[in-house]
């Protein structure tokens, strides 16, 4: 959920010796190893980082660095964080519960439910499944909205109606024929929210609350709506393409069901574990959720995007999850399919550059920590930051890269 470019296209191809190693056991996390990798993130330039790692029945929560640049307050692991596009996994799960209930079909044309919003041939051709796996061919409205600091200033204080966000995306040139190819678009998930409302007659965020947040007791997770603040303990949110600026107060209605949510690392791990354990969806529907399309067809090792969730090959097996990027907060939440390894982590700074930039040292340090958490027994954890593989960010991919002009 961001105006930016990809952090890195793929995880690097590793030597055969690394790939051949057995996956890590579900034993107790190596706290010293994790602490060293986490501490390296603020040392590389991030104000603060927080994380929760779960291995089997053992949890490790920690933070490093500063919550604010303007006052000496350390980052705390329980702080709430804007999770951006990880919102999509919650929303997709709610849509798929409607599928399980027989109230909606994945291959229903969107125009069946939203005839006035997506009229005509496009409404007949684009299906619910295409929205959820980003193969609809509908443009990404955020690319049209964000082109300068002035635009960001306006977004920060503006309340957007979901229908207006969708209209912006539909007015953009198609990114491809419906169903033809993956092209990440926030418009798809605003439409998914409108679908929830059309089917249930209820507010989409309220349906996510009722179906997912309340049953799982995710008390640190919410849709803030038009409230620009983050309720409860939180850090600053520093947007830094041209110098750090705190954007922790932001009207997130521009993200709505594509990227509005706030959560904690503990809540994210609880949610994804319940999802992948089959507690939220039927086995058949969960299987469809995980059946993905290539994110970069020319690079199969980049992983696949399912229905609101993506797969990521690593040296110790496949992980599932999502990342999120909004102004000032970046988040990853990644999980092994069997539930023995989970990591959710966030940093309180974001930067976007035109084109395909070389990774910043703090990008590399953070990804090194994430890989250490996922693969503690592989040789990834012993690599230097300069040679560590890089994780993809679907929220910052080519074609999802509105450029921010200098102020």
Each predicted region: which residue ranges?
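Secretory targeting and sorting signals
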Residues: 1-22
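Catalytic loop of the DD-peptidase/beta-lactamase superfamily, centered on the K-T-G motif
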Residues: 19-62, 249-407
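Hydrophobic (often cysteine-bearing) scaffold residues that line and stabilize catalytic clefts
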Residues: 30, 34, 83, 87, ...
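Residue-level preference for non-acidic, small/hydrophobic
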Residues: 38, 57, 88-91, 95, ...
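Short active-site loop at a secondary-structure junction
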Residues: 47, 70-130, 176-185, 256
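Short, solvent-exposed loop/turn elements at domain surfaces
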Residues: 60-62, 70-73, 140-142, 353-354
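Short, surface-exposed loop or secondary-structure junction motifs
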Residues: 121-319, 323-325
